[in-house]
């Protein structure tokens, strides 16, 4: 049962590969968003 589950995992991950490719960019996006937000408050 476990070997069958492990053999099917790569097929399941193929569907999520675009999401996994985007995931490392999300923290950078939030960092830039926080920087722009602080800059906007500082300029006001």
Swiss-Prot record:
<dbReference type="GO" id="GO:0015979">
    <property type="term" value="P:photosynthesis"/>
</dbReference>
<dbReference type="InterPro" id="IPR003687">
    <property type="entry name" value="PSII_PsbK"/>
</dbReference>
<keyword id="KW-0602">Photosynthesis</keyword>
<protein>
    <recommendedName>
        <fullName>Photosystem II reaction center protein K</fullName>
    </recommendedName>
</protein>
<keyword id="KW-0934">Plastid</keyword>
<comment type="similarity">
    <text>Belongs to the PsbK family.</text>
</comment>
<keyword id="KW-1133">Transmembrane helix</keyword>
<keyword id="KW-0812">Transmembrane</keyword>
<comment type="function">
    <text>One of the components of the core complex of photosystem II (PSII). PSII is a light-driven water:plastoquinone oxidoreductase that uses light energy to abstract electrons from H(2)O, generating O(2) and a proton gradient subsequently used for ATP formation. It consists of a core antenna complex that captures photons, and an electron transfer chain that converts photonic excitation into a charge separation.</text>
</comment>
<feature type="transmembrane region" description="Helical">
    <location>
        <begin position="23"/>
        <end position="43"/>
    </location>
</feature>
<dbReference type="Pfam" id="PF02533">
    <property type="entry name" value="PsbK"/>
</dbReference>
<keyword id="KW-0472">Membrane</keyword>
<dbReference type="GO" id="GO:0009539">
    <property type="term" value="C:photosystem II reaction center"/>
</dbReference>
<dbReference type="GO" id="GO:0009535">
    <property type="term" value="C:chloroplast thylakoid membrane"/>
</dbReference>
<feature type="propeptide">
    <location>
        <begin position="1"/>
        <end position="7"/>
    </location>
</feature>
<keyword id="KW-0674">Reaction center</keyword>
<keyword id="KW-0604">Photosystem II</keyword>
<dbReference type="InterPro" id="IPR037270">
    <property type="entry name" value="PSII_PsbK_sf"/>
</dbReference>
<keyword id="KW-0793">Thylakoid</keyword>
<comment type="subunit">
    <text>PSII is composed of 1 copy each of membrane proteins PsbA, PsbB, PsbC, PsbD, PsbE, PsbF, PsbH, PsbI, PsbJ, PsbK, PsbL, PsbM, PsbT, PsbX, PsbY, PsbZ, Psb30/Ycf12, at least 3 peripheral proteins of the oxygen-evolving complex and a large number of cofactors. It forms dimeric complexes.</text>
</comment>
<keyword id="KW-0150">Chloroplast</keyword>
